Amino acid sequence: MMKKKLLFFLIIFFSITFNSFSIEPDIFVQSTVNRASKLLGEDITKDKKIEKLKLIAKETVDIRGIGFYTLGKKRKSLNEQEKKRYAELFEEYFLKSFSSRLAEYTNPEIDVQSKEKLNENYTIVNSILKATNERPEIKIDWRIYTKNPDNPLIRDLIIEGLSLARTQKEIGRAHV
């Protein structure tokens, strides 16, 4: 009887403990933005910034999910080996494209404004890229994949209403 009580207690304890480590999507976005902003402000070469941005992207972006979304219905006609090769090529392309564009920014200030839980798998986080003398204020919405609350991932950026994932899909369609 004592073993059952102990087992019950441990199950409850660990389920509460594990759930307490889940990260809220808005905090995840602000943390990711802060990491990237700090990196972009560092006095290191552009190549070093690009390499470090790639690491941040690998940790925070659902590159595989975006890649297969980009592929669309064509994904169903590929065998496992072709899917694996496509995922590798897409990741390489995505990281190079993403990091080289982002490395051009210096000290971007992004403030998270709000979040809207769409369902168990997705939350939209609303933010603003603050205006500077060189650019106006820009509205950025982040589609966060929250199926695993301990590891939220960025699935899309919607910049001033334009979905980067959808744009990528249209570009992909033109080349496939």
Regions of interest found by a model, annotated:
Residues 24-102:
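Early exported N-terminus immediately downstream of N-terminal targeting peptides
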Residues 137-166:
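Short beta-strand edge/turn micro-motifs at domain boundaries
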Residues 8-17:
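Bacterial N-terminal signal peptides
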